[in-house]
Amino acid sequence: KGKRWGYFPSFSAGWIFTEEDFMKDNDWISFGKLRASWGQNGNQSISNFIYSSNISYLPQGYYFGPDKLVTSPTAIPANVPNPDVTWETSEQLNIGLDARFFKSNLGLSFDYYNKMTKDWLVLAPILGTAGAGAPYINGGDIKNSGIEFTLNWKGKVSDFIYGASFSGTMNRNEVTRLANAEGIINGSSDVLSQGTASISRVEVGFPIGFFYGLKTDGLLQNQDDVDAYLTPEGKPYFEDLRPGDVKFIDQNLDGLINDDDKVMLGSPLPDFEMGIQLNAEYKGVYANATLVGKFGMQVMQSYRSFADNFTQNYTTQIFGRWHGEGTSNRIPRLGYASTRNINLISDIYMHDADFVRISNVVLGYRFNELLRNVKWIKGASVYTSVNNLYTFTRYDGMDPDVGYAPDSWASGVDLGLYP
C-alpha cells in the first residue's frame, strides 16, 4: 500500500551544431548533433503480489529439521512476506554525438552512459528456521557505465552498391550496495554436481554474478611434487594426496584449503561486445553478412564435473586427463575414493570464452528490373540464408555464448547441451 504508483521523470536536450553559421561553409561534415539525457525508469517486469505470500497445501505434511513434526495434511506460507518492498528504479545519464561526413557516406554515433539501478529486487537469503521461502527485498544498487559507438560507411561505384558498419560496447558493471550485513549474496549450490558449493556470487565492489572459488597451481606431477606440497608448518594439506591431484592455492597461508581461500575466478560479463554488418549489391544480386563478438568474459564448464564421474558418460576431453607425469596440467587424474579434485569449486572449470561468430549470411537476387513493367507487382526476390555459420574461438565447449545459471542474476554456466 502506498507503493502501487511511481513517478519517473526524464529530460533530454540536443544541439544540431551543423546548423550554426560557423559550420555553413564546411564540405566535410553533413550533419552533427550533440545530445544529453537523464531519466528514471521503474522495473515493471516483476511478478504480481511479491509483497505477500501464497499458501502452500502439503497433503503429506512437512519436515522441520531431522524429524517429521507435522504428519497430517497442512498448509504453510510459501514464502516470507515483505510489505515494504518497492520499485526497482534505474537512473541513467547519457551524453552522445551523432555525425555524418562526406555527403553522409560516413556515419558516426557515440554514447557515454552511466546507469545506476537502485533498490534491486532480489530474493533474500534466509535461514531454514524461517519455515518458508525467501522474500523479495530491495537488496542493493548496481552500477553500469561505459561507451557505445557505431561507425558505418556506404558507397556506390557504377552499379556496385556496398556498405559496412562496425559497432561496439564497453561496459563496466559493479555492485555498489547490498542490503545485508555481509554485503554478499551467494548463488545456488549443487550446480556443478551434487554437494558442491555455489559458483556465482554478488558482492559489493565486484561485477554481479562473478565466479567464485579456489585458485590452483596446476597438478601434482610426481611424488616429489606431492612431498613438497606442504602447509607453512610443514604438514601435507591432505593425507591422501597422489600424483595427478589438483594443487590448490592456500591464499591466506593458514595451512587449510577452505572457503577462506576462495577468490574471484572470472566474470561471465564481457568487457567488450562488437558487431559487424557487411552488405553489397550488383545488378540485383545482393549479399549480407552479420558478425558478432564478445571479449573478456569467462565460462564455467559445469558439464565436466558430471562427465568426470564413473556413473556418467565422458566427453572426449577426458582423454586429456592426467595419466602420468607431464600428460596434463589441468584435468586431474580419475579417482573413485576421493572427489576433492572435482567437488571443490576451482579454476580448473574456468575458461576464457572470447569469440567472433558469423551469425548470419544472406545471398539473394531481386527481380525489380525484370518486373519494372508489371504494374501489379512492386518487387520480388529469392534468397537463401545461413544462421550461425561459424564461430572463431579457442573455447573448447559446445558454445561460448551461454547465458544459463540457476539464479536470475547469474550466467555463463555451460551444461554441455546443444546450443
Where in this protein do the model-derived segments appear?
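Outer-membrane beta-barrel signature, preferentially recognizing the C-terminal barrel domain
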Residues: 62-107, 135-157, 205-213, 267-272, ...
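Solvent-exposed loop/turn elements at secondary-structure boundaries
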Residues: 24-88, 105-142, 179
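Transmembrane beta-strands of outer-membrane beta-barrel proteins
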Residues: 30-34, 95, 106-108, 162-164, ...
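Residues on the lipid-exposed face of transmembrane beta-strands in outer-membrane beta-barrel proteins
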Residues: 11-15, 95-99, 110, 149-153, ...
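Conserved small-residue
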Residues: 50, 137, 154-266, 387, ...
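C-terminal beta-signal and terminal closure region of outer-membrane beta-barrel proteins
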Residues: 56, 60-63, 139-144, 190-221, ...
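Extracytoplasmic gating/loop element in the C-terminal half of outer-membrane beta-barrel translocons
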Residues: 221, 238, 243, 294-389
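Transmembrane beta-strands of outer-membrane beta-barrel pores
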Residues: 1, 17-19, 38-42, 112-118, ...
